[in-house]
Every structure is written in structure tokens, then in C-alpha cells.
Amino acid sequence: MDPAVASLGILALTTASAIIGQTIEDVETNIGSQSNPNSQVQLAPQMGNLHRFFNKAIAGEPFAYCTFCGVSGAITVATLYLHLPAVIALAIGAAITTLIWLAYSTTAYLGRVSGSATFNQPVFLDMLTENLGPIAGHAFIVFFCMTGVAYLMTLPVKGFAHPFPIPVIGMIWGMTIGAIGSAVGDVYYGAEAEFVHKKFGGGIPVASHGDITRKGVLGARSPMEVGNFTVKYGSPITGMAFGLIVLSITRGVYNIE
């Protein structure tokens, strides 16, 4: 195959994986309230507003995804040494990392929410069981895509062959998607999804802090409703932002024309 064609193909696949991974990352962190607006979720019980949100924000998005994308990359490299196909190795790395992510999410939710017991905030076990599945599914896609991007960047093809190992590249991109998720997607989540009962465009005055939207279409609002809200606009825009960054960096650094 012509090296130029191979480089363009890898560039397209890398960009597509970046867009998908970042989009799903924003949805996952919105479902788990692991983002900047989680402070409003944490503050709500203190203001007398009990809720049914899943809150696992004991670590911000950048550091959490930096760590776990690095773990996924390390497991993938270890699996590649077994001479398994790259797709299988990526899937195994993402799957094992997702199991660790579930343990992290469970302990984070129980610890974070039980810390509000002083303000009579209960721990809803159904929120734990109902949301772990979507969190795991979204997290698997993120780890698979980000580790895939790191793997593609190390292929011995003209314009790529990055000198850094896969785990290090995964950590760099993990921190990047966490930062972009906080900077782009969280604006839509925190300023709109959590305050839909407030006047649109009016900002969030200090007096409204903690007064989050707790009622959904039917009964109490659930984390999945937040995910459904943000996936319509905020998450795709976040994915496009990261995809364009990866595309521009890859073309600029490796001179792919």
C-alpha cells in the first residue's frame, strides 16, 4: 500500500476515534456528575434540595481519565505481547479497565453521597444499580477509542511512529479529553441541564447555587435524563472540538498532506 494512502487512512481513523471517544466521555461524566457542575450536585443537600443524582466526582475528569487511559494502554501493551490481534488487545485492555472504573465509581458514589448524610441526603441503591451499566458501557467505548488513538499513533507508518509508548500517549490524551469535557461540555450541562427551571440566559446567581433541577418528566430527575439532555448538543460539540484538535495536531506535527 502507498505510504501516503496509509497515513491518510490512519489519520481519518484517529480523528473518528477521537470524536467518538470525546463525545461518549462527556455523556459518561454527565451521567455520573463527574464534572465541574458536580459541585452544584454536592451543594444541593446543604441547601435543602435532596436529589437522585449519581455523584462520583472524587477526582476531576482530567486526572481520572489520565490515570485510567494509562491503565488501559498498559494492559493493551501487555496483551499485544501475547501476539493477539490489535483489536482484541484493545478490547481486553478497555474491558479490564472498565471493571476497575466500576469499582471506582461505586466507592466514589457511596462515599460522596453518604458524606451528605448530615443534611439527610439518602443513598439510593437503585441509582447505583441502574446507572452502573450505562457508566460501564460509555467508559468502555472511551477507553477503547483513546487507547486506539494511542496505538494508531505508534504504528510504523510514514508520518506516525510516535516515540512515546502507548500508555504514555493514552495518559496524555486522557487528560486532554477530561480537560475538554470540563471546558466545553460542562458549560451545557452546568449552565442549562441543572437549571432548566430557571430563566434561560439569566446566568446562575449565588442565591441559586444548589437549587438544581430535581424534577424530570415523570417524577424525580435521574442521571440518565441528564445524559439524554446533553447528548443532543453539548456532547457532540465536545467531540468535534477534540476531533479537530487531534486532526490539526496530527497533520501539523507529522506533516500529513
From Swiss-Prot:
The keyword Methyltransferase appears for this protein: yes
Catalytic activity: 5-methyl-5,6,7,8-tetrahydromethanopterin + coenzyme M + 2 Na(+)(in) = 5,6,7,8-tetrahydromethanopterin + methyl-coenzyme M + 2 Na(+)(out)
Membrane-spanning ranges: 4-24, 62-82, 84-104, 132-152, 164-184, 229-249
Key words, A-Z: Cell membrane, Membrane, Methanogenesis, Methyltransferase, One-carbon metabolism, Transferase, Translocase, Transmembrane, Transmembrane helix
Gene Ontology CC entries for this record: cytoplasm; plasma membrane; vesicle membrane
GO BP field: methanogenesis, from carbon dioxide; methylation; one-carbon metabolic process
Any matching Pfam family: MtrE
Pathway(s) annotated for this protein in UniProt: One-carbon metabolism; methanogenesis from CO(2); methyl-coenzyme M from 5,10-methylene-5,6,7,8-tetrahydromethanopterin: step 2/2
Membrane topology listed for this record: Multi-pass membrane protein
Record GO terms (molecular function): tetrahydromethanopterin S-methyltransferase activity
Compartment(s): Cell membrane
E.C. number(s) listed in UniProt: 7.2.1.4
Family: Belongs to the MtrE family.
Function: Part of a complex that catalyzes the formation of methyl-coenzyme M and tetrahydromethanopterin from coenzyme M and methyl-tetrahydromethanopterin. This is an energy-conserving, sodium-ion translocating step.
Subunit structure: The complex is composed of 8 subunits; MtrA, MtrB, MtrC, MtrD, MtrE, MtrF, MtrG and MtrH.
Protein name: Tetrahydromethanopterin S-methyltransferase subunit E
Underlying gene: mtrE
